[in-house]
Amino acid sequence: MATMHDKITLQLPAKPEYVSLGRLSLSGIASRAGFSYEAIEDLKIAVSEAITNSVKHAFKGEDDGEITVEYLIYEDKLEVRVSDNGTSFDLETRKQEIGPYEVGEDAEMMRIGGLGLFLIETLMDDVKLYYDEGVSVVMTKYINEKQVEENAKSIST
């Protein structure tokens, strides 16, 4: 089991204007952890989608919601937890309602909903959803060891 080195927690109001704060924090944390530029871009998209989902769906535009974003830094991975205490949902039921996306499907004709979670699952190495008082999305991205070595060599002390 990997040892956690650091844990950083953000408490964000459930408002669209704070999505960028979660994304920018992640960018700095992932860079410091040794992720490549491409991996950081994937992480930023996934975290933005998770926070946006909480803003849009958990609180339905109400101003009193709060989203917790936790960044857990391990020696070989970064785990990001986006949690809210808003309205929960059942993922499997939602997937059945919207149906599968087909390769080559016209983007103009796609059903609304589910695409954010699809993106998150595509961009991250592991994604888990937990339903308790709201929804928690736990996303994991592993650090490429070669990239960590290259970054370490380029840092001067």
Curated annotation (Swiss-Prot):
Disulfide bonds: none annotated. This is Serine-protein kinase RsbW. Negative regulator of sigma-B activity. Phosphorylates and inactivates its specific antagonist protein, RsbV. Upon phosphorylation of RsbV, RsbW is released and binds to sigma-B, thereby blocking its ability to form an RNA polymerase holoenzyme (E-sigma-B). The gene is rsbW. Pfam families: HATPase_c_2. Belongs to the anti-sigma-factor family. Its EC number is 2.7.11.1. Coiled coil: none annotated. HAMAP family: Anti_sigma_B.
